[in-house]
Amino acid sequence: MNDAKYGVLLVNLGTPDAPQPDAVKRYLAQFLSDPRVVDVSPWIWKPILHGVILPFRSPKVAKLYQQIWLPDGSPLLVYSRAQQKALAQRFAHIPVELGMCYGNPSLNEGLTRLLAQGVEKLIVLPLYPQYSCSTSGAVFDGISQLFKTMRTIPSLHFVRSYAQHPLYIKALVNSIDESFKQHGKPDRLVLSFHGIPERFIKTGDIYFDECCLTVEKLKQQLDYPAEKVMMTFQSRFGREPWLSPYTDKTMEKLGSEGVEHVQVICPGFSSDCLETLEEINEQNREFFIHGGGKQYEYIPALNDKVEHIDLLEAIIRDICEK
């Protein structure tokens, strides 16, 4: 292994620079303009985005970010930086940088830092365990666009997914077990993944299959009845059908059916963010309690836990040692 020539670019979705409407508007404009995310004709979509969605949605989303913002910034950025720092300490001669698909630090910034250190073999590691065209696919597009401006490009190893990597499953199982020990075993364990339009699956996206792989591996390794494990999908946007069952509707239903205790984990989120800390830990808690439930716990993302860093290190070393 020639350590000096390798470099790692960790990539996550991104975050606004500040929990203020203007910053949120800039971030959402970039995010929702990506055809991988919203694949509607720009002639139709741009007037709706800039004339309706951004003016009305940005102030509302900014208020939500204000509720979860940390002293050092957005939770997603804080935890992603911590992952980068911890991972860099595992390698003596392999630089590790961070880039966001949308917002800052940008993909360009992360790649530029690596190339300035003489990297010739680039490992791009999107922090999305399950592949989707709207996440990992968007990262690939972003890297490809940057390569178009370069006379000499580095060799590329792109990590498409790690939905059933043994260390990933182990880390999730241990997080769930820790929650069980602290709060007791729930009546239901809900595995909530980010949703995507059903249309994406029908046209070839493997995301649903990869979510199922993760769920089946967890069922096999958890000391918990498989029939009490539920897979749901959150964060739907727009009017077309998305992957179901929907997390929010499931919470309402469970509460109304007499289920008293649920615990929720979001296996597809490598870092806690707005969708986990506010949508799952706050909104869906209310749905469950108001529906009649009594006890609700959110199990945090893997964030910068040692077991998560062990996983990322193993993925990288496996590539470098081939």
From Swiss-Prot:
A biological process term (GO) from this entry: heme biosynthetic process
Binding-site positions, Fe cation: H194, E275
Pfam families: Ferrochelatase
Pathway field: Porphyrin-containing compound metabolism; protoheme biosynthesis; protoheme from protoporphyrin-IX: step 1/1
Top EC class for this record: lyase
Keywords for the protein's UniProt record, in alphabetical order: Cytoplasm, Heme biosynthesis, Iron, Lyase, Metal-binding, Porphyrin biosynthesis
Record flagged with keyword Methyltransferase: no
Subcellular location: Cytoplasm
Any one Gene Ontology cellular component term annotated for this protein: cytoplasm
EC assignment: 4.98.1.1
Molecular function via GO: ferrochelatase activity; metal ion binding
Catalytic reaction equation(s): heme b + 2 H(+) = protoporphyrin IX + Fe(2+)
InterPro entries reported in the protein's UniProt record: Ferrochelatase, Ferrochelatase_AS, Ferrochelatase_C, Ferrochelatase_N
Main location: cytoplasm
Function recorded in the entry: Catalyzes the ferrous insertion into protoporphyrin IX.
Family according to the record: Belongs to the ferrochelatase family.
Protein name according to UniProt: Ferrochelatase
Lineage: Bacteria, Pseudomonadati, Pseudomonadota, Gammaproteobacteria, Enterobacterales
